Amino acid sequence: MTKELEEYLGVEKVIWVKEGIDPEVTNGHIDDCATFIAPGVVACIWTDDPDYPFYRQCHEIYDTLVNATDAKGRKLKVYKLPMPEKPCFMSEEEANSIDLVNPRTAQDEPQIASYMNYLVTNHGCIVPQYGDVNDALAVETLQKIYDETWGEGVFKCVGVDSRQVVYGGGNIHCITQQEPSA
């Protein structure tokens, strides 16, 4: 499978993570878990809270990436992007606001609220926000990562409330089709 995927994508190496954070709705899309910022530079989701619903996946993904190399055998530089401090759950009012025949997630299940599912534009990042205390930290962390990687001021990271999007089973990166100008 790996060789076929490498040929199909025209890449020299694929790095596999064991499990994403949403096996039920999206089959664990990688855009909720990790993203390459530049060649050899990757960010992944992180929490220190062992009671967080996706604690195990965060740590497994981080371990996979810090032990991985790029196609030329070089170690990756891995940044940690925090998860929301509190898992995101849908209220009854929010559940009733979604016009779906079969809602994607139940109210008692944690939503796949990850700051990683952000949109990169030509010189900016649009970062999901959930009304959580870590919202500002996520934007600041991504801004720092992009400044360190590409130079200060090349990218501008901003937050946008995306709770209604996440309740439908995706987020900003999922619902957009990125096409850079160059």
Residue ranges of predicted features:
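Histidine/cysteine-enriched polar flanking segments
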Residues: 1-182
